[in-house]
Structure formats: C-alpha cells, structure tokens
C-alpha cells in the first residue's frame, strides 16, 4: 500500500493547492504513525489513519534547498531501529523524528577491494562515509580517497567553497571515520594525529609533503561548527609544518578557534564563523552514552532476568546531548544568509552494537531520534531545508524469541509494553560483533527529498545533496 501510494505520487507529479486544514491533515497522516488503538482489537495495530496519496503529493518539493541537515545513525540498520522503538515506545509506538520523514527508500552500501576493485560486500564506516561525502566507492579504512589513494573533494568542502556555513557534529571522537570523512583525505582511518600518521600513513604526513593527520586536516578544513569528542588527540604535538612543536589544541587557539568543553560553555556561544569557528571537545575519547545495562552473554536471555536500562551517571548535565549539539549547530549556522550544510552523527549505536550492549545501543538510537526531531522542527519553520536520515552500514543485533537458545550472545529487556524482548548478537566471537551488509533505510523531508525514494546507492546521496544545494 505504501509503495503504490509513493509510486502514484511520484509518477503523477501533480502538486495541487491545499488548504491549511488539508495541510494539517496531510502532516498528521504522514507523521503520526502510532498504532490507532488497542493492538488486541481488529484494526487496533493499524498505523495508517487514511489514504496517503494527497499527503505524499503535497510533500513533494523540487525546488533547490538552501540548507541540508544530514543525520547519520552509525550502524543503525532496520533491526537497530526496531529494537529501539520496541523498547522505548512499544510495538505500536513510533519515533517522532526517525519515523516522521515522509519519503523513504533503501540504499546499497558496499566497499571495494583495494587490489581488485571488486565489491567488498560489508563496508566499514570509513569507506561508507567516503561514499556519501565524495560520491566515490573506496576500500575499507580509506577516508576521502579512492582505491588508488587519489583524494576527492567532499560535500562539506564544496559547500564551504560556495560560501555556505558548514557544521560537523558527532558523539564520537572527531577523528573517527564518519566526521573525519567530511574534512580529511588519508589512506588509513587510524591516522588520528601526527605520530600515528608518520607510521601508518607516511604519504599523508606533513614531513612527507602530505596534508597531515586527520586532526590537522580538520583544523585546515575550518568548518564553522565542529562538535564531539576526541580531545586527547588535540594534545599531540605537530612534528612538521608551520605549527611544528605546538600541540594541535594550541594551534587551534592560535588560528582563532573558540574551544568549549561542556554544555554550559556551548550554550553560551552566540556566534561562530570563519573568523572564530567553534570547536567543541566534550570528551577525551568518545562521548558517554545515554543508558547503561548488562552486555549480552551466552544464553543471557535464558540464564539471566530481563532488565530495564538505567541512565549513565557519566552523562550528567555537563555533557551536551546530541539534540543540544544539533540545536546549537543549527542556531549558529542558520545565521549565514547563503545557507548551510550540517552533518550530525549518532556514533555509538555502532560502538555499543560492537560491544553487544543492547541498552547502550538503544539509548543512542533514542538520542539520534531526538536530534532528528530538532532538525525537523527547524526545517518545517524554515521551508528551505532538506533533512536526510540514514545509516552508514547495518549491524549485528537481531530480535529473537525470548526463549531462543541462540548460539551467540543474548540479553532480554523489559520494554515499554511490559513485555520481554530478547536481543541476540551472533555474527562474531565474544570480543566484538561485526557489521553486516544488508541494504539500509534512507528517509528525507523537504526540497529534493523524493530523490531518496526507491533503491539507490550510498554514493547517490552525495549527488542528491550536491544537486539540491546547486554545488559545482
């Protein structure tokens, strides 16, 4: 039913005038996807409150976008979204951000073998981020370069060159693959600072005539707003170039960056631009996650009681949430009359999936949803903003029957429904679960949002964003 309605809307391309009442009704049909009633009753589990045809037609907008907000749930496959929704909202519930975008598709995401150029069906975050930031497929571990190690201009670099404000927000270290792909070009994602770059990416090192480590390239890229973790690497000392002998933090300050380290100092910032770009460093490494709970274990769903996730005491009021960082980035970037490009990453869905920690993973998905809500609130008021929500790769968690005797690691959770949901991680040994290669959900709202519908590839996202902003 959904697919036929989308096809009808896209094929007809008849955008008819609608009244304010019709618009309100259309928005409700598309966005309110909660179950309509008692799920034990006939029709109670239905999510549709009416025909979608007019609502979808009204959502189509082929005008250029002034702004783009791209939100990435790292490792957020369909299973991760469903598990988080079941736990936090219930089986008949819905996310007011992730589930509220009207136009939805699926995209493929594979890397390439560096030697043969053939598909590597399971991508890492570096190759996947390079795909949507440059439009180029590459090998796992590469950032901003192709399989021949040639650099390619990123969407952030293009936006900045066109006079747009730019932002890069993540709950990970800012040197981690997803944020780093916007601002760096290195042969290995491990090259965070000068010392490791000299060892693992010698061709990228400043002393060899390269562009430097990821952190040095981040400073050179000079996005207007950069927020996340990774303060530890900024304590490293430059080993070559103009800033040799100074720490990367000292370099940032000398080059005019305003550095903040907690929620209060972030909230106090009122301006950020090329004269005084904002650099938020809120953790030595990755930022603390929202929820705690036991990691999955062998037969954990059978041998241990179901648990309820608890708040992480390390994420106190001094640590800005992803929604708060998104809000501040939008507030600052939207002051540029030419528009802006902003990428926001909920990084630890992936990291907690690797650790087989369902509470950590679910809490980070809820965090991302709150950030999506903030982006949509701005986009609806602004009218010229394209919001896109997707992931970089799929991951290992699966929802299984509570009494399953699974071969992998499992943990049972008490959901909002008062029911038990078991999560299983079974594609790797106990130390770290691995990515998976199934296609991913991509959803959008605003100008050019229709270009995510149907089956696309991760590289299509780069061209969709480039065209929407009219970048050359």
UniProtKB/Swiss-Prot annotation:
Main location: periplasm
Enzyme class: hydrolase
Top-rank taxon: Bacteria
Active site: 125
Metal-binding as UniProt keyword: yes
Subcellular location: Periplasm
Cross-referenced NCBIfam families: PRK10518.1 (NF007810)
Protein name as it appears in the record: Alkaline phosphatase
Biological source species: Escherichia fergusonii (strain ATCC 35469 / DSM 13698 / CCUG 18766 / IAM 14443 / JCM 21226 / LMG 7866 / NBRC 102419 / NCTC 12128 / CDC 0568-73)
